């Protein structure tokens, strides 16, 4: 008969193994050509090689994060009720939104909460996450997915809203220059356009088309489809950014590390509810870092030496 202590160790090992598998499944692409000049917009110049996630963080991945760090309590609102509601009449953020799908359900009681990705949404990018939730996810990965370790690591979140990336961060939210370079930069000598920056983040100057998920068109994207139109990551496999990343235009806005207007953080890429114009390199948005939105997610970056 197995002893309780052994069963506990086995359970912990199983949990850690599952987390390791999740990390191993993360696909990363390399953004090279160190020291490239910035675009005419002023963005995109990066002095070093780095990697960026090929896809945005998914509902399934974020639910695993919640299961690890927010089962006992959730003081930082890493999960919000909007994630588990289908129709939201008031987000409490100055506007009315309807027909917003669920993404993650929470069951149980404090101390034993369980987070369940909605099956039809588990491969979609997670949404309803704040900028600070994205940083805490980065800290969790930086710390090796240890239970509850979200307040330090890649970022020190004990010092208020003015957080900065640690010099020893293993993973991080990309800066605007990093994200912009990954999305739009391709040297002319390697097939890029004049000036080495594309207008849209799928290697094209041509206006993208709003196509159904699964389209093989090289300039397809998810936009003008409403909140319920958010598609699984990688739904447009041939619409790649120059570095090979997917979904950098449309589907969900992505949180950027860079601050603007003192208290805001940059958003890039456009989203399913917005039109094609938001996918352009000269378009940036911003939002309050402590708020969560039904069309905003994130992806992370790391050093090229990983």
Predicted regions and their residues:
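Bulky hydrophobic/aromatic "packing anchor" residues in well-ordered structure
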Residues: 31, 36, 52, 62, ...
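Bacterial N-terminal signal peptides
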Residues: 4-15
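Disulfide-stabilized, aromatic/cysteine-rich ligand-recognition loop
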Residues: 20, 44, 235-241, 260-306
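Short, well-ordered junction/capping motifs at the entry into regular secondary structure
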Residues: 161-168, 213-249, 285-288
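GGW-centered surface loops in extracellular recognition modules
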Residues: 21-40, 162-164, 168-171
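Active-site microenvironments of metalloenzymes and redox enzymes
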Residues: 44-45, 51-211, 260-261
């Amino acid at each position: 008969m197995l002893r309780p202590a052994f069963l506990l160790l086995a359970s912990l090992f199983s949990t850690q193994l599952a987390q390791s598998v999740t990390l191993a499944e993360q696909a990363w692409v390399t953004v090279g050509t160190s020291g490239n000049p910035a675009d005419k917009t002023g963005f995109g110049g990066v002095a070093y090689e780095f990697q960026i996630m090929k896809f945005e963080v998914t509902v399934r991945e974020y639910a695993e994060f919640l299961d690890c760090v927010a089962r006992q309590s959730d003081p930082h609102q890493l999960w919000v009720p909007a994630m588990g509601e289908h129709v939201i009449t008031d987000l409490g953020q100055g506007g009315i939104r309807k027909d917003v799908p669920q993404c993650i359900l929470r069951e149980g009681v404090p101390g034993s909460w369980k987070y369940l990705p909605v099956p039809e949404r588990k491969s979609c990018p997670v949404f309803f996450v704040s900028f600070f939730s994205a940083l805490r996810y980065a800290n969790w990965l930086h710390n090796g997915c240890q239970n509850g370790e979200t307040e330090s690591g890649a970022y020190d979140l004990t010092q208020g809203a003015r957080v900065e990336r640690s010099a020893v961060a293993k993973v991080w939210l990309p800066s605007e220059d990093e994200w912009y370079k990954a999305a739009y930069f391709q040297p002319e000598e390697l097939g890029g356009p004049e000036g080495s920056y594309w207008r849209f983040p799928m290697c094209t100057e041509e206006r993208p088309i709003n196509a159904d998920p699964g389209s093989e068109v090289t300039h397809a994207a998810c936009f003008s489809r409403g909140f319920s139109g958010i598609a699984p990551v990688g739904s447009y496999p041939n619409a790649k950014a120059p570095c090979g990343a997917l979904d950098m235009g449309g589907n969900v806005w992505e949180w950027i590390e860079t601050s603007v207007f003192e208290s805001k953080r940059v958003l890039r890429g456009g989203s399913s509810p917005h039109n094609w114009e938001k996918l352009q390199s000269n378009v940036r948005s911003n939002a309050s870092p402590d708020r969560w939105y039904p069309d905003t997610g994130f992806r992370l970056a790391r050093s090229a030496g990983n």
